From Swiss-Prot:
One of its GO terms (cellular component) is cytoplasm. Its EC number is 2.7.1.23. This is NAD kinase. The keyword Transferase applies. The keyword S-adenosyl-L-methionine does not apply. The gene is nadK. The active site is at 72 (proton acceptor). Keywords: ATP-binding, Cytoplasm, Kinase, NAD, NADP, Nucleotide-binding, Transferase. Signal peptide: none annotated. GO terms for biological process: NAD metabolic process; NADP biosynthetic process.
């Protein structure tokens, strides 16, 4: 049987016993099948001195498949880097929910074996690009797979800002913040804040206010081509933040403008054959099964 992939990168959560165990099994299993295996440097030492230790960028350059062992947080961290490369990404779930990690940690061999033989489905997920502008100059930027969140930082309190869609004024807002989410992120922070679930194939963004001081403000879904602009009131007394996937923080000052748009980068997710998004939702969210 011909191989669908040849060079494979292993990524995982450092200093986590469950992840360490699965990574060692994966490395041995893949090496015995003559795959060229690279291991992210943060976890390479835990597997042994004989492994090929590389960073995430090198995995993107050298490999045609990356296997992420951990939870969705680990997948998000890897995805923000790997999305710029032509590499497939699949996850082994060692976290809690695992919306993005399909393979079971203790019995991954059968499903992964079929994937490596070419029995898989490919799904492309777009990312967000967030920029902070100050006095007409971009001060910082980063990407997000799930969401970009404008918020006050460590202490929750109400902030004031204006929201523009494609330079058209939508409304002013007094709230604890604003979540701008992709369909991928619609089952994460956005869902907890009352946002709708968007199926991954939708080219759309959802804006979810956080605890707005009004009874009429609701989440709104806009086209993914839209450019979202959040203008922070100069009267806000404290420095704010834009959080990308909860991992990367961009500092924001009163009067700054935050631009959020769809990134040109797309994550190429690999799923086992027969993957069903609604089956994942039922399992993870406790929905009822079929009645007949």
């Amino acid at each position: 049987m011909s191989k669908a992939f040849h060079s494979i990168g292993l990524i995982g959560k450092p200093h986590h016993s469950g992840t360490h165990k699965t990574l060692k099994r994966l490395h041995h299993w893949l090496t015995m099948q003559s795959y060229d295996v690279y291991v992210e440097e943060r976890v390479a030492a835990e597997i042994g001195p004989q492994v090929k230790s590389v960073d995430l960028l090198q995995i993107g350059e050298y490999c045609d498949l990356a296997i992420v062992v951990g939870g969705d947080g680990n997948m998000l961290g890897a995805a923000r880097v790997l999305a710029r490369f032509d590499i497939g990404v699949i996850g082994v779930n060692r976290g809690n929910l695992g919306f993005l990690t399909d393979l079971p940690p203790d019995t991954f061999e059968e499903a992964l074996g079929k994937v490596l033989q070419g029995e898989y489905e490919t799904e492309h997920r777009f990312l967000l690009e967030s920029e902070v502008h100050r006095h007409g100059e971009m001060k910082s930027s980063n990407t997000a797979v799930n969401e970009a969140v404008l918020h006050p930082g460590k202490i929750a309190h109400m902030i004031e800002f204006e929201v523009y869609i494609d330079d058209k004024f939508m409304y002013s807002q007094r709230a604890d913040g604003m979540i701008v989410s992709t369909p991928t992120g619609s089952t994460a922070y956005s869902l907890s804040a009352g946002g709708a679930i968007l199926t991954p194939n939708l080219e759309a963004l959802i804006l979810v206010p956080m605890f707005p001081h009004t009874l009429s403000c609701r989440p709104i879904v806009v086209d993914a081509c839209s450019i979202i602009k959040l203008v922070v009131s100069p009267d806000n007394g404290d420095a704010l933040e834009v959080s990308c996937d909860g991992h990367v923080t961009l500092p924001v000052l009163p009067g700054d403008e935050i631009i959020v748009r769809r990134s040109k980068e797309r994550l190429r997710l690999i799923h086992p054959k027969g993957y069903n998004y609604f089956h994942v939702l039922r399992n993870k969210l406790g929905w009822g099964s079929k009645l007949f």
